[in-house]
Amino acid sequence: MKIILLGAPGAGKGTQAQFIMNKFGIPQISTGDMFRAAIKAGTELGKQAKALMDEGKLVPDELTVALVKDRIAQADCANGFLLDGFPRTIPQADALKDSGVKIDFVLEFDVPDEVIVERMSGRRVHQTSGRSYHIVYNPPKVEGKDDVTGEDLIIRADDKPETVLDRLAVYHKQTSPLIDYYQAEAKAGNTQYFRLDGTQKVEEVSQELDKILG
């Protein structure tokens, strides 16, 4: 089962990715997590990515495509995977298709911009695992602490309101065209496309996903 998640930053993709991973036992491939790991390790790619991400800009296609292709070739992706944050542009989608990867489901999470700004300002992240929480919508069991490890949660620099607005502008310009792209792919019989109302409660979105993928 090979799945692509579409939706603006803060649309709830990360939370639902956890549900899909637990339910179907496939790994999540998040380019954001990959780049954050590279940043933490202080690699050259990580330094380049950090400068761009801090400004709310996207990392160039050639860096991202190479990273993802290496990742989906690994053994744990044999039964499928979940792509979150890739592809972000039409050239990336074409590169994925050209590499012979067949996508089974494309899931779009639809949320208005103003809701996303409110959501992301309350987001808290466990840096090591990438687990994501929200102080209102999906709080940790203990305030400020990761449910699994008990370690501190952080506020990412790119969750600040001014950076969120910049990221949304980039999303609408570069990534929104993928909605039309994958709807056309679905009409051609190359994948299945579903749009979900991401303003629903987390549990309601999960139930809808269960019906679609089950």
Swiss-Prot record:
CDD domains from the entry? ADK (cd01428)
**Which segments carry the region annotation NMP?**
30-59
Using the UniProt record, give the first listed, main subcellular location: cytoplasm
What EC number is given for this enzyme? 2.7.4.3
Its pathway? Answer: Purine metabolism; AMP biosynthesis via salvage pathway; AMP from ADP: step 1/1
- Which residues are noted in the entry as ATP-binding? G10, A11, G12, K13, G14, T15, R123, S132, Y133, Q200
Q: What class of enzyme is it?
A: transferase
Instruction: Give the UniProt entry's GO cellular component terms.
Output: cytoplasm
Which positions bind AMP?
T31, R36, K57, L58, V59, G85, F86, P87, R88, Q92, R156, R167
Q: Which reaction does it catalyse?
A: AMP + ATP = 2 ADP
Any one GO MF term held by the record is: ATP binding
Name the Gene Ontology biological process terms.
AMP salvage
The subunit field of the Swiss-Prot or TrEMBL record says: Monomer.
Q: Which PANTHER family match?
A: NUCLEOTIDE KINASE (PTHR23359)
What family is reported? Belongs to the adenylate kinase family.
The protein's name? Adenylate kinase
As recorded in Swiss-Prot or TrEMBL, the protein's gene is named adk
